[in-house]
Amino acid sequence: MQKFISMASFEWPNRIVPSGWLEHGPFAFWLMEQLKPRLTVELGTQRGYSFACFCQSVKKMKYPGRVICVDTWKGDEHAGIVDKMGDEMHADLQAHVDENYKGIGELKRTFFSEALNHVEDGTVDLLHVDGRHFYDDAKEDHTTWIRKLAPSAVVLFHDTQVRDHGFGVYKYWAEVSAGQPSFEFEHGHGLGVLQYGKLHDGPLADMLSPSLPEVTRKDIRAMYSRLGVGINAHYEHQRYRRRFEERKNPLKKIAKELARPFRK
């Protein structure tokens, strides 16, 4: 079990924002350490939590890696983005990248299909598919980007455990992972990890191997689920603290007014 965890698994995300991906931060840091992708592409970003985790890893390991995220920041049936939220998210994430990850992270505000023209074939070492979550969309996003994958690449699929609201990623994941080197985390809405081509021998290849004992798979899931809960708990604590402060300030103002001497 020790080879499936390292100090990278305990890295703390520098950008913690509302995200269904929060609990996968620990695995993302470990994955980046193992794979050291020279080019990572994320399809679907919103507030950029996972994207920032990838960038943070590259910066810490000090190797020539690039991370590109692609999104229109206009939202869809599953994103919950309305009005000008997309513009605000994009601006906030761009500011974060400018401040912390110049030369590493790049935002492309366009459609996934249009971004294909900006990436060379056979160069993507890590592809993260997290766009619209209908079956056909997940399939299209994956298949249209396959030619961009490097000979030893890994593809991530988020929301593999969600089966309501029209989500169909779980169906597509069941198809592409059947009999293939892969691993699925069940916490954090589910995260599928699919091997493309042949990986170099090592812990990552062992984790994705079909011969990995089921008991070991359960232990790995439990380990990373426990680590992920810590990040989610921190986010919830900060969220409730902000709400408390927002409600407390008006009360403090009223108390101050009541404490003032009465004047006729």
Predicted regions and their residues:
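Helical coiled-coil/dimerization "stalks"
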Residues: 243-264
